[in-house]
Structures are given as structure tokens and as C-alpha cells.
């Protein structure tokens, strides 16, 4: 006979919080949309975010592309700018078409890698994205990144020193290689376990998938 075991608080400690991996590049305009809404959406569903900054450039180069496909294909690029403006209006985030696209993003990505498990990661990513896609300001200089870290009350000099260390530079290279191994071909990309979801328009599907994997906190006992 199958019967429920009486609730015990220890079950909650044994049930892992569902996780969504969020692979992004600050140069990616569609990653901007996801960065600006993922934390609130994940919180509503009690889903943890695994922040995975990586470089899109080497991914594109592996396909023989010298630039973003949006820049290599004029019709696609023209459509993309219209689509981004509509999507920003829909979710209520500011938008200014950047004068340089795609922008350099290595330095803020290195900082994001340092902060990936820190409570400030979401706020930092939002500030960098807003700087790029709402304010049309450079994001890839120590001065720019320091300004955003300082605005968050963080020790900018110490964080930048760690971000620029040889060890952290290698970590970003390894993370970008890991993206290639996982089959990532663009950003944003989300993983729930081995299930991949590509594009900002699949964020909600990825979050729903993660939430559905939440284990039953009142497991059945067979006996």
C-alpha cells in the first residue's frame, strides 16, 4: 500500500531549488531583454538562476562568421532593430539603438564571471545592459565598469583586479569553450538540465520547465 509520509521540515532541505542556466553576452541585444526580466520572473516561480557569461564572438567565428549575423544579413538586421524596439516597449524597458553594434564586452563579462554567484550579479548585469542599450555608452573600459560597480556600492578596484587576473581570463575562455561544447550558437540561451532553450522568447518556457521539475516536498513512502 502506498501512503504519504507525515510532513517533516527536513524534506525541504532535501529538495533542490530548480535551476535555469542563463548564458548571455552583454553585446547581445536579445540578452538585454532577458537580463532585464529574468530575476523577477524566476523569483515568481521559485527558480534559481545560474548566471553564465560567455563570449559570442568565438562562437560566431567557429561558424565562419566575421560579425553578428544581424550585421551580415541586412534584411535580418533591419527586422531585428524593429523587433527589439517593439519588445522593449512591450516589457517596459528603455531602448536606444547603440551607435556601435555589437559592442566590445570582454571586461564586463569578466566581472560578471567574478560575480556570478554573488548577490549583486543581477543588478550589475542590468546596469551594464542599460548602459549599452538604453544610454548608448561604452561598457568595455575600466572606467565604465568601475562606474557601475561603484554605483552599486561595491569595491570596484578589487573586483576589477580579480576580473583582470590571468586565472579569471582563462575562466572566461573556458566558459566560452563550454558554451561551444554544449551546442550554444547564440544568446541568450537557457538550459534546464540538458534541455536547451534559445532566445529571449523562450525564457518563459525555460522557466516553466525548471519550475515543473520541482520535486514533491511530501514524497510518498511505499510499504
Which role does the model predict for each range below?
Residues 2-5:
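Extreme N-terminal basic, low-complexity initiation segments
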Residues 7, 11-21, 25-47, 127-223:
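C-terminal cap of thioredoxin/glutaredoxin-like
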Residues 32-132, 209, 220:
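Structural alpha/beta surface segment adjacent to cysteine/selenocysteine redox centers
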Amino acid at each position: 500500500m502506498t501512503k504519504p509520509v507525515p510532513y517533516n521540515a527536513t524534506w525541504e532541505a532535501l529538495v533542490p531549488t530548480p535551476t535555469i542556466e542563463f548564458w548571455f553576452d552583454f553585446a547581445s541585444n536579445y540578452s538585454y531583454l532577458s537580463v532585464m526580466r529574468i530575476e523577477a520572473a524566476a523569483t515568481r516561480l521559485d527558480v534559481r538562476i545560474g548566471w553564465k557569461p560567455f563570449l559570442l564572438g568565438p562562437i560566431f567565428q567557429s561558424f565562419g562568421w566575421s560579425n553578428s549575423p544581424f550585421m551580415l544579413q541586412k534584411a535580418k538586421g533591419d527586422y531585428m532593430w524593429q523587433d527589439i524596439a517593439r519588445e522593449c516597449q512591450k516589457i517596459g524597458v528603455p531602448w536606444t539603438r547603440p551607435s556601435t553594434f555589437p559592442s566590445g564586452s570582454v571586461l564586463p563579462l569578466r566581472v560578471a564571471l567574478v560575480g556570478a554567484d554573488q548577490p549583486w550579479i543581477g543588478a550589475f548585469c542590468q546596469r551594464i545592459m542599460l548602459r549599452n542599450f538604453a544610454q548608448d555608452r561604452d561598457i568595455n573600459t575600466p572606467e565604465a565598469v568601475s562606474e557601475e560597480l561603484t554605483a552599486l556600492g561595491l569595491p570596484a578596484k578589487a573586483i576589477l583586479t580579480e576580473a583582470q587576473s590571468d586565472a579569471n581570463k582563462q575562466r572566461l575562455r573556458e566558459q566560452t569553450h563550454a558554451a561551444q561544447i554544449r551546442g550554444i550558437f547564440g544568446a541568450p540561451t537557457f538550459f534546464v538540465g540538458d534541455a536547451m532553450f534559445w532566445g529571449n522568447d523562450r525564457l518563459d518556457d525555460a522557466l516553466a520547465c525548471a519550475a515543473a521539475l520541482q520535486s514533491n516536498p511530501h514524497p510518498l513512502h511505499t510499504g
